[in-house]
């Protein structure tokens, strides 16, 4: 599947300092090395939100690029599930991913869009209210939440989520100086809050040779073990994108 919208690959972030759309090059320079810092993201979304009319900011690509992957997965999950599926868009920023799932999923969903930046959360709340975003299924719900995803188990109950989506959050953390530990914490906590039938999908431009080794290492010794897989999403402008699927697997009884 060819990606039909390309916006910002993290590995090319430094090139943005030359782009006409950015006037404060210091913002991008700081972002490159401080992607794990809340204050950095508050500044990022404040400066982007002050540029006039609101526009969703997407890392990698927008919802159309993964629509044919996400919606069938939700439909399959709903066949053996009573009530709305609980979906977490982790590190949502001002992406339209969560709202698009809410407005296009035929099966009932409860979409929680969570971000560490209250600035991003407020921008998204205001935008969806002003555009009167409506659900595809009348039983669906959309909520925005300020949340540090390293504290996920303090907010969500064990085995309460059906699907966790990560479009750029882990990539941002592992590329920052002090973020790899946080990325590992998020992965292990995700496994704790996912239902046994659930999945954690990471969308990334990192090559499987590197990401799979990291994922398999991080899930070892976790309270909930996991199966790890990957499929290629597509390629555009020389950048390949992948979907890494991490699924909880109960430990065998001794």
Curated annotation (Swiss-Prot):
Main location: mitochondrion
Superkingdom of the source species: Eukaryota
Organism: Danio rerio (Zebrafish)
Protein known as: Citrate synthase-lysine N-methyltransferase CSKMT, mitochondrial
Keyword S-adenosyl-L-methionine appears in the UniProt entry: yes
Single GO molecular function: lysine N-methyltransferase activity
Transit peptide interval: 1-45
Entry-linked SUPFAM superfamilies: S-adenosyl-L-methionine-dependent methyltransferases
Major enzyme class: transferase
GO cellular component terms listed in the entry, alphabetical order: mitochondrion
Keyword field: Methyltransferase, Mitochondrion, S-adenosyl-L-methionine, Transferase, Transit peptide
Function noted in UniProt: Protein-lysine methyltransferase that selectively trimethylates citrate synthase (CS) in mitochondria. Seems to conduct trimethylation in a highly distributive manner rather than in a processive manner, and thus introduces a single methyl group per binding event.
Listed EC numbers: 2.1.1.-
GO BP: peptidyl-lysine dimethylation; peptidyl-lysine monomethylation; peptidyl-lysine trimethylation; protein methylation
Location within or outside the cell: Mitochondrion
Family membership: Belongs to the methyltransferase superfamily.
Reactions accelerated catalytically: L-lysyl-[citrate synthase] + S-adenosyl-L-methionine = N(6)-methyl-L-lysyl-[citrate synthase] + S-adenosyl-L-homocysteine + H(+); N(6)-methyl-L-lysyl-[citrate synthase] + S-adenosyl-L-methionine = N(6),N(6)-dimethyl-L-lysyl-[citrate synthase] + S-adenosyl-L-homocysteine + H(+); N(6),N(6)-dimethyl-L-lysyl-[citrate synthase] + S-adenosyl-L-methionine = N(6),N(6),N(6)-trimethyl-L-lysyl-[citrate synthase] + S-adenosyl-L-homocysteine + H(+)
Modulation of this protein's activity: Citrate synthase-lysine methyltransferase activity is inhibited by S-adenosylhomocysteine (AdoHcy) and oxaloacetate (OAA).
